[in-house]
């Protein structure tokens, strides 16, 4: 994933988003039982450890139109990517939120009053955010993982994870069974893909921060050229099943696709494993169980970065992933073999270009416009109600010359696409006038989605009918969080002059 060649407002969408809530996944053999998920997943990004984003609350299709603003809280952090790009977690009536300066706040859900704040003032491109577990709030800055006391915000430990100057951290951690999971990525806030960066997933002891094991998502040899190559890494919190496995998606290889020096990725021959992949490991040891690569030898920054959604459909345990190639893939969770694939959004036939370049057949790649572009496809996490998958889509192109150089694309628009989890067929879609950089969230028979220009939409999960729209005071590039009768929407980036980012709490009846 790269931030080069795009204006500031568009860059924010590259900071992938996570959303957080409290819910259990019912009827999912691949993940934990519903009861276990509710306890283990409390405060987990993606709602639960299966990353279903299926929240518990009193909001449904009969009353969602009664949502009104209850309170607001200014977002004052400063970075090149706005003030905020992650959804807070909500645990026992307290919101835990991290801004794009890496600062963490605990906020009273009822009143919006700040209970405590931990300042780091370390600008981050995002997505970042926190996970709450075992009395601690776990998070990251651009170079360390840390644990804070859940009640006071006092730092318990901090662990340096970077192995070189070409690496950074841009994710909310995962937490499971006494371990915290954090990945580096081969890019920094100041220099995208400087070369030599290896995306590495670390498992840390939750009590001490001590490193237990690590998994290199790409080889340290970097396919033969450690000066300019790099790649992989995890941008989103991983998922876990009840068999002790961890699932995650990975980023693209570098150099950045389309650079004049290496337009077809000549410096990194081969498929560039394990980039653009879903990977399953033993969570206790880091042992590789299987991998699936969606885009070998990626040329277009088509990360397969979404957190896998774990569920059961038609008696089969599935791990459903997606990324910037704009293809949703359901894999058999036991074997990693594809069950179905569903392209979403706009495509125009460049899916095999990486394979052509890998075979030395670059002349067969057609110059012109490429869909999805570098800011297109599925950028944000998906959600599910157990039978339908809700996919946020960004439609936007890039251009490619006959010599392999990439250029800027055009305007971005968005969609929310509902896919039957069993068959992979599209049930309905809703189009937005701006990009869908935020993850959808399900609560009962309602799915809540956001559009970059500052809108929050509620749709009926079965029909796709629009039920409610909220207008925010600034742009939003993340999903909402839901608890009880309240929706928390971080409007984290000014998209027009005079706008001021702030968190808006919507509540039934105001």
PLM features: what roles do these ranges have?
Residues 29-31:
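Bacterial signal peptide processing site
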Residues 70, 113-117, 154-158, 212-213, ...:
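A structural motif specific to WD40 beta-propellers
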Residues 39-47, 81-103, 122-145, 168-194, ...:
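Repeat-blade elements of multi-bladed beta-propeller folds
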Residues 108-111, 149-152, 206-208, 283-285, ...:
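Short loop/turn segments that connect beta-strands within beta-propeller blades
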Residues 34-70, 405, 411:
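Blade/loop signatures of beta-propeller domains
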Residues 298-299, 348-350, 357-365, 431-438, ...:
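Conserved blade-ending motifs and adjacent loop-strand segments that build the rim/top face
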Residues 24-27:
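C-terminal motif of bacterial Sec signal peptides marking the signal peptidase cleavage site
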Residues 72-78, 120-123, 160-164, 214-228, ...:
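Surface-exposed loop and turn segments in beta-propeller and other repeat-based domains
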